[in-house]
């Protein structure tokens, strides 16, 4: 136990090119309150290990967060979310209205589904030449303060290659976080 020698687990966790999959995911969860699903944990650890191989350095929590933001959160091409609204359209239906920038062009889309993610998936399939399957999505709360944020994760399967890609989104809205995650995954798919 690290406490036996006056340390904490955080002080002895090292992520480098020889690290296993859990190190970077553990640091994201403990330092940034982001819990990755298993498949995304594997994908992200490979990205971190490649970065560690390229630099020859240990990956600190801050570097791991910067890579996470770069790979999942700050993607704005070819899709960028401009606005999003969701309204009940019956007992089990919601209608979304979204404005996206797609390859520099503003596109307004509307569609109905059994929830906001389903409706947005339907709208994107109807308006863009993108073939994918929504394989999984989920979210967790990043803090319990009055400024709580949701961290969401989406897994898409490419309709052409059958490869999985993950996207992530963070927002104070529990509706917008998975919407942002879907856009992130679409941008990684493209």
Task: Locate the predicted segments by residue.
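A mid-to-C-terminal "edge-of-domain" accessory segment
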Residues: 1-110, 144-149
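Small-residue-enriched alpha-helical segments and adjacent helix-cap loops
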Residues: 89, 95, 103-128, 132-143
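Mixed-charge, glycine-accented linear interaction segment located at domain edges/termini
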Residues: 161-166, 170-190
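Generic long, charged, amphipathic alpha-helical segments
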Residues: 130-163, 168
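Terminal-proximal interaction/regulatory segments of ATP-powered molecular machines
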Residues: 112-116, 124, 154-164, 179-181
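Short alpha-helix boundary/capping segments
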Residues: 16, 108-115, 166-177
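Glycine-rich phosphate/pyrophosphate-binding loops
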Residues: 31, 35, 39, 129-137, ...
């Amino acid at each position: 136990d690290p406490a036996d020698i006056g340390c904490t687990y955080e002080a002895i966790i090292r992520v480098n090119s020889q690290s296993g999959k859990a190190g970077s995911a553990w640091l994201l969860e403990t330092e940034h309150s982001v819990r990755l699903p298993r498949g995304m944990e594997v994908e992200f650890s490979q990205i971190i290990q490649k970065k560690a191989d390229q630099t020859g350095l240990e990956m600190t929590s801050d570097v791991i967060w910067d890579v996470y933001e770069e790979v999942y959160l700050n993607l704005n091409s070819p899709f960028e979310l401009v606005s999003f609204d969701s309204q009940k359209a019956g007992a089990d239906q919601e209608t979304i209205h979204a404005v996206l920038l797609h390859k520099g062009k503003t596109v307004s889309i509307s569609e109905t589904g059994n929830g906001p993610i389903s409706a947005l998936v339907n709208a994107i399939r109807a308006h863009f030449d993108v073939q994918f399957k929504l394989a999984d999505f989920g979210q967790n709360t990043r803090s319990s303060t009055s400024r709580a944020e949701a961290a969401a994760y989406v897994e898409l399967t490419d309709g052409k290659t059958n490869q999985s890609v993950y996207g992530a989104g963070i927002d104070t809205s529990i509706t917008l976080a998975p919407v942002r995650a879907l856009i992130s995954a679409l941008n990684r798919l493209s």
